[in-house]
Amino acid sequence: MHIIYAVTTCSDRVYQQLFGDVKVKPAFQSQKYHRLLIEGLAKGAKVDVVANPPVNRSVLQKNFVQLPREEEGGACYRYIPAIRNPILKAAAVGIGTFFKTLFLIRKDSAVIVDGLNRVTALSAMLAARLRGRPCVGIVTDLPDMLGGSRFSKEFANFVIRHCTHYVFLTEAMNDYLNKARKPYVILEGHSDVTMKEKHPALEKKSHPRICFYAGGVSRQYGLKNLVDGFRAADVENAALHIYGPGDYVEELEAIAKEDPRVFYGGMLMNQEIVDRELEATLLVNPRPTEEEYVKYSFPSKTMEYMASGTAVLTTVLPGMPKEYHPYVYLLSDETAEGIAKTLKTVLSLSDEVLFDKGMKARAFVLEQKNNVIQAQKILEMLKRK
């Protein structure tokens, strides 16, 4: 089977080169999501990536840059030109993606797109439909529940509606979007199979104990409650480390200046984040569950957390299958007071108990939910008649 994966992305090598020293790293979550899925697909199919580099005018110094074709993770990356002028860039992305996809298609090809990369997805989808080949739409968020104009939401919904197959995060997402009952597969996420090469060890843990969060640093994601709850818990020999961008950063930096137990580390490359996760005692996801969008989501950070072998504390996300529950500590009360109480309880456990919990979670996601296994489910869906 031949997969043409059309998306806003680049190889990990190019991403490191472009953004390694940049304070704000664009599309860092989607970059890892797609890279892992591409590498997983490449274990069972030939993969060509029609890649629109995730660059903007602040990074791109030249008016026009054409990155060379390259191989990484078993896939071939074929780049759309990077152009500073936004109008010319949109045109180049649309036209370039369409023709690159069109000319790559063969009898055993299937096209995969990110339904939220509107121009890229539309262009690749049209090429697939023109050649009579399947087009798989990956949907990681509902357009109707994202910010942006009504036009941008309708545009994304149009692209998603005209795909022939789907990858959804949750069954609720399928019920909402897939009214025509087209073939679909639920992939709540995928862990990085190469994490098996890492060797977590209790003696490598930092002291004082570190409660750790990496991701969107915004009130919407429960960061204020996490910080307030941690400070109220006042657990001896423990610190809270937070990484990522968001609207809560300014207030968080002010708190970190006055409270030495709280540390804000800005944005780091993903490998640096993973290294710090291995050193932490507890990884926390405080995302509130009352918002409507939450039942349609599964934070990719959950997979990364669990694969690290460090114990995880998370809210009871409705999009998280119950098979995950035995492997994590669950936060049922999401208020600052509830977080404080739960942190006191969890951090009263011994290092050995917490480490054992984390290692069981690691075994679960690396053996049953890694990117190779999850990608194979997409290939199996495409093989079914």
Where are these regions (language model features)?
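A charged, aromatic-enriched C-terminal amphipathic alpha-helix characteristic of glycosyltransferases
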Residues: 44, 188, 334, 351-383
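Conserved acidic donor-binding segment of nucleotide-sugar-dependent glycosyltransferases
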Residues: 328-337, 345-351
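Donor nucleotide-sugar binding/catalytic pocket of nucleotide-sugar-dependent glycosyltransferases
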Residues: 33, 144, 157-198
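Membrane-proximal helix-turn-helix segments that form the acceptor-binding/catalytic region
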Residues: 34-39, 99-106, 119-122, 126-131, ...
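Nucleotide-sugar-dependent
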Residues: 221, 271-276, 285-304, 314-323
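Nucleotide-activated donor-binding/catalytic signature segment of Leloir-type glycosyltransferases, i.e.
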Residues: 250-277, 282
